[in-house]
Swiss-Prot record:
Component of the BCR(KLHL12) E3 ubiquitin ligase complex. One of its GO terms (biological process) is neural crest cell development. Kelch repeats lie at residues 278-325, 327-375, 376-422, 423-469, 471-516, 518-563. SMART domains: BACK, BTB, Kelch. It is found in: Cytoplasmic vesicle, COPII-coated vesicle. Residues 131-232 form the BACK domain. Residues 29-96 form the BTB domain. Substrate-specific adapter of a BCR (BTB-CUL3-RBX1) E3 ubiquitin ligase complex that acts as a negative regulator of Wnt signaling pathway and ER-Golgi transport. The BCR(KLHL12) complex is involved in ER-Golgi transport by regulating the size of COPII coats, thereby playing a key role in collagen export, which is required for embryonic stem (ES) cells division. This is Kelch-like protein 12. GO terms for molecular function: ubiquitin-like ligase-substrate adaptor activity. Pathway: Protein modification; protein ubiquitination. It comes from Xenopus laevis (African clawed frog). One of its GO terms (cellular component) is COPII-coated ER to Golgi transport vesicle. Signal peptide: none annotated.
Length: 564
């Protein structure tokens, strides 16, 4: 029989338990640690094995090498007791009350396990009120992973972080570093501007002189014209500073002179990277001339596509929205009939998740429009296989229930649905006889639909999305041609403007906004299905082709989802 090495899991634990018992009974102890006049008998070999600090003390030619007593400075006796317990038991009790003493002591005595336990504990305690302080604490003690975690947390929760006292007590240089960061996750620059103003007002006498310097890091050209005129222009701190007014004038010029935007590119016109948002493309009509169930994800940071779990049912003419961490795939056509069924995916970046069914709509709908308002999903129009619908219904995910709302004035399939300023807009489509240019808006407070200025071009199967207070409509079909043209609706003036056309005609195209840019995804160009994607940058009024999907398709659902 061949010899075999056998390892027992209990051996090391048994030795530690015995050594700890010997320590407590002061048996075979050969050194006493003295902390604030309190003595802690211990074993040199155990201390040296666990701590580089003690190993160097007892093996090098230091004065403490042969002494029976060693004075330890810089920590309390209660902290020393916790650390010795860890040395002999591998267990450390970390609390909110002791962590600020324990971590520096662990660093001093080079107890890596305690240091890591303290860092893990502090990371678990991060919240908007303490993340800035924890970051500074971590930096002081060279805890790089904790420092990075706290920094990322402050970026991810920026609007909440700046409401707390820790932010108000930052030095100017620390405020600059935070607001200069590309990675802070915000939906607009408004929280950044307001954070700067509030920080200055917290100690106006000392800080007012810092305002022009801080405002250089606020990307005011990316704010809406209304916010600039209604809020920034009215701020007394801005009005009494010539340097601040110059920065505001720059932002106004950016909006008033779009032809000059390409010359104004710089740090203040660069959209922040913000949240790790990804783009999902779901289902559609594929190259096999049938509905598909394929789901692809685009990450703008890597500019790469990947495949996610397929939906449970093949669908074209599908509507898709995201709400929180969930993606909803609504209605569509499976090749045999129009659908009322709805699928949902709970998604995080760490786990792809699985699709499951939620309550079906009251009406079967293909080519319906869908959008979200508050924490509700709204779906309107569509074709059920025999007629086009004027109806709209609303889904409440909290109770998993659909309810019918007021009808549109015109039946539509292939229309776009989008929310702007708390109002729902339905644009274009096909009524069974004509391609439409008309636009209706729904006021959720009154429950009524009304017409607004129609589009310049009639369109069905166009992509629709909201970008910088304008509703963009891209591509579609006008009854004769597949369109590459783009127009934008100004909500304030109730008027349309023709924008730069896409590089490719696209009907049944998906459209969505990601990181301040408008994406037009796939579609049909009149000859073939597309897998190409192009991206519109409003700052330079230009389209650029980005990485193509793996799958050629039209009629797909498109949405943007924020990864955790």
């Amino acid at each position: 029989m061949a010899p075999k090495d056998i390892m027992t899991n209990s051996h090391a634990k048994s030795i530690l338990n015995t050594m700890n018992s010997l320590r407590k009974s002061q048996t075979l102890c050969d050194v006493t640690l003295r902390v604030n006049l309190k003595d802690f008998p211990a074993h040199r070999i155990v201390l040296a094995a666990c701590s580089d600090y003690f190993c160097a003390m007892f093996t090098n030619e230091l004065s403490e090498k042969g002494k029976p007593y060693v004075d330890i400075q810089g920590l309390t006796s209660s902290t020393m007791e916790i650390l010795l317990d860890f040395v002999y038991t591998e267990t450390v009790h970390v609390t909110v009350e002791n962590v600020q003493e324990l971590l520096p002591a662990a660093c001093l005595l080079q107890l890596k396990g305690v240091k890591q336990a303290c860092c893990d504990f502090l990371e678990s305690q991060l919240d908007p009120s303490n993340c800035l302080g924890i970051r500074d604490f971590a930096e002081t003690h060279n805890c790089l992973e904790l420092m990075q975690a706290a920094e990322v947390y402050s970026q991810k929760h920026f609007p909440e972080v700046v409401q707390h006292e820790e932010f108000m007590l930052l030095h100017q240089e620390e405020v600059e570093k935070l607001i200069h960061c590309d990675e802070i996750q915000i939906n607009s620059e408004e929280p950044v501007f307001e954070a700067v103003i509030n920080w200055v007002k917290h100690n106006r006498h000392e800080r007012e002189k810092s305002l022009p310097q801080l405002l250089q890091y606020v990307r005011m050209p990316l704010l809406t014209p209304r916010y600039i005129t209604d809020v920034i222009d009215a701020e007394p701190l801005i009005r009494c500073s010539l340097q601040c007014r110059d920065l505001v004038d720059e932002a106004k010029k950016f909006h008033l002179r779009p032809e000059l935007r390409s010359q104004m590119q710089g740090p203040r016109t660069r959209v922040r990277l913000g949240a790790n948002e990804v783009l999902l493309v779901i289902g559609g009509f594929g190259s096999q001339q049938s509905p598909i169930d394929i789901v692809e994800k685009y990450d703008p940071k890597t500019q790469e596509w990947s495949v996610l779990p397929s939906i449970t049912r093949k669908r074209r003419y599908v509507a898709t929205v995201s709400l929180g961490d969930r993606v909803y795939v609504i209605g569509g056509y499976d090749g045999r009939s129009r659908l009322s069924s709805v699928e949902c995916l709970d998604y995080t970046s760490e786990e792809d998740g699985v699709w499951y069914s939620v309550a079906p709509m009251n009406v079967r709908r293909g080519l319906a429009g869908a959008t979200t308002l508050g924490d509700m999903i709204y779906v309107s129009g569509g074709f059920d296989g025999s007629r086009r619908h004027t109806s709209m219904e609303r889904y409440d995910p909290n109770i998993d229930q659909w309810s019918m709302l007021g009808d549109m004035q015109t039946a539509r399939e292939g229309a776009g649905l989008v929310v702007a300023n708390g109002v729902i807009y339905c644009l274009g489509g096909y009524d069974g006889l004509n391609i439409l240019s008309s636009v209706e808006r729904y006021d959720p407070h009154t429950g009524h639909w009304s017409h607004v200025t129609p589009m310049a071009t009639k369109r069905s199967g166009a992509g629709v999305s909201l970008l910088n207070d304008h509703i963009y409509v891209v591509g579609g079909f006008d009854g004769t041609a597949h369109l590459s043209s783009v127009e934008a609706y100004n909500i304030r003036t109730d008027s349309w403007t023709t924008m730069t056309s896409m590089t490719t005609p696209r009907c049944y195209v998906g459209a969505t906004v990601l990181r301040g840019r408008l994406y037009a995804i796939a579609g049909y160009d009149g000859n073939s299905l597309l897998n190409s994607v192009e991206c519109y940058d409003p700052l330079i009024d230009s389209w650029a082709v980005v990485t193509s999907m793996a799958t050629q398709r039209c009629d797909a659902g498109v949405c943007v989802l924020r990864e955790k």
